Amino acid sequence: MSVDLGIDLGTASVLVYVKGKGVVLKEPSVVAFDRDSNVIKAIGEDARLMLGRTPGNIVAVRPLRQGVISDYTVTEKMIKYFVQKALGKRLFKKPRISICVPSGVTEVEKKAVEEATFAAGAREVHLIEEPVAAAIGAGIDISKPCGNMIVDIGGGTVSYTHLRAH
């Protein structure tokens, strides 16, 4: 049986959608790690609680800036953690993952998201521009021949798109 996930990888938070179950996870995009050993100490809400409250060797960071990856390795580990947390122990087959990217990002930035998602354990990766994902999430049929203005306000970006099917 195939497992399909949708991930909104945001600057401020990550949402994970599991087909047939809906949104199963919403956590901050924060990772805490030991600067000396490079060992991850916490991810998500647990790491957010550590922001500004850690000893000098523990650093809590947000690995995305303005919707794009600023720390590839940390982002990969964060994606892997959230996928495993969303699916629990039932991960027999690698999931297919559709993951959002801001509109207007470069091909290099798109490739980084795709590679990090594959490295995190995906068997297939589909990149979806955030405004298109927002439209689908809002119940808009993007295949209908009518225009829609979509404004996506995120933690690190604001984007707008005019969607029109032909």
Regions found by a protein language model. Name each.
Residues 1-155, 163:
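Nucleotide/phosphate-binding catalytic cleft detector across ATP-hydrolyzing
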Residues 159:
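Positively charged, low-complexity, intrinsically disordered RNA-binding extensions
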